[in-house]
């Protein structure tokens, strides 16, 4: 008797490949009630690319404690918050800090995707991207779109 080899392009292989990545709509199901303004799918992709470029230049702050410390010191940049972080109390004070200091901020759907964009295997609930000459064009484009989003009431 011979073994029957599984077809590498069969339906099981395709199902496994698709199950690893969730769609934008699936990620929106787990959002916090405070996750406003929420980035669109297109803006989310632009932010991920900008974050990846910022990581290469070491122009990034990640984590609540580090971001809060540097915002208090007066550092400028775009704050990107994950909309699926629980409990909300972990980072609910950060949007207020941003509004007091006129810093742009935006929520994206997934903390795991945010951590992956920052080059980490761990989920990250907040990242601050600082401007730099190497990726200034991408940064300015993201900044303009984030500032055009309506702030919550």
UniProtKB/Swiss-Prot annotation:
The modification Phosphoserine is found at residue 19. There is a cross-link at residue 5 (Glycyl lysine isopeptide (Lys-Gly) (interchain with G-Cter in SUMO)). SUPFAM superfamilies: L30e-like (SSF55315). There is a cross-link at residue 5 (Glycyl lysine isopeptide (Lys-Gly) (interchain with G-Cter in SUMO1)). Pfam families: Ribosomal_L7Ae (PF01248). The keyword Metal-binding does not apply. One of its GO terms (cellular component) is telomerase holoenzyme complex. Part of the H/ACA small nucleolar ribonucleoprotein (H/ACA snoRNP) complex, which contains NHP2/NOLA2, GAR1/NOLA1, NOP10/NOLA3, and DKC1/NOLA4, which is presumed to be the catalytic subunit. The complex contains a stable core formed by binding of one or two NOP10-DKC1 heterodimers to NHP2; GAR1 subsequently binds to this core via DKC1. The complex binds a box H/ACA small nucleolar RNA (snoRNA), which may target the specific site of modification within the RNA substrate. During assembly, the complex contains NAF1 instead of GAR1/NOLA1. Keywords: Isopeptide bond, Nucleus, Phosphoprotein, Ribonucleoprotein, Ribosome biogenesis, RNA-binding, rRNA processing, Ubl conjugation. Required for ribosome biogenesis and telomere maintenance. Part of the H/ACA small nucleolar ribonucleoprotein (H/ACA snoRNP) complex, which catalyzes pseudouridylation of rRNA. This involves the isomerization of uridine such that the ribose is subsequently attached to C5, instead of the normal N1. Each rRNA can contain up to 100 pseudouridine ('psi') residues, which may serve to stabilize the conformation of rRNAs. May also be required for correct processing or intranuclear trafficking of TERC, the RNA component of the telomerase reverse transcriptase (TERT) holoenzyme. One of its GO terms (molecular function) is telomerase RNA binding. Its main location: nucleus. Belongs to the eukaryotic ribosomal protein eL8 family. Coiled coil: none annotated. It comes from the Eukaryota. This is H/ACA ribonucleoprotein complex subunit 2. There is a cross-link at residues 3, 5 (Glycyl lysine isopeptide (Lys-Gly) (interchain with G-Cter in SUMO2)). GO terms for biological process: rRNA pseudouridine synthesis; telomere maintenance via telomerase. It is found in: Nucleus, Nucleolus; Nucleus, Cajal body.
């Amino acid at each position: 008797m011979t073994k029957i080899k599984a077809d590498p392009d069969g339906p099981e292989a395709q199902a496994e490949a698709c199950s690893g990545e969730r769609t934008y709509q699936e990620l929106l199901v787990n959002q916090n009630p405070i996750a406003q303004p929420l980035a669109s799918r297109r803006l989310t992709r632009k932010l991920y690319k900008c974050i990846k470029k910022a990581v290469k230049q070491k122009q990034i702050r990640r984590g609540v404690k580090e971001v809060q410390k540097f915002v208090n010191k007066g550092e400028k940049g775009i704050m990107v918050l994950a909309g699926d972080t629980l409990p909300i109390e972990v980072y609910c004070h950060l949007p207020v800090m941003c509004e007091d200091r006129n810093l742009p901020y935006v929520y994206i759907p997934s903390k795991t995707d945010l951590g992956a964009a920052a080059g980490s295997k761990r989920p990250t609930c907040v990242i601050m991207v600082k401007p730099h000459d190497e990726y200034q064009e991408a940064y300015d484009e993201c900044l303009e779109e984030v500032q055009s989003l309506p702030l919550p009431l």
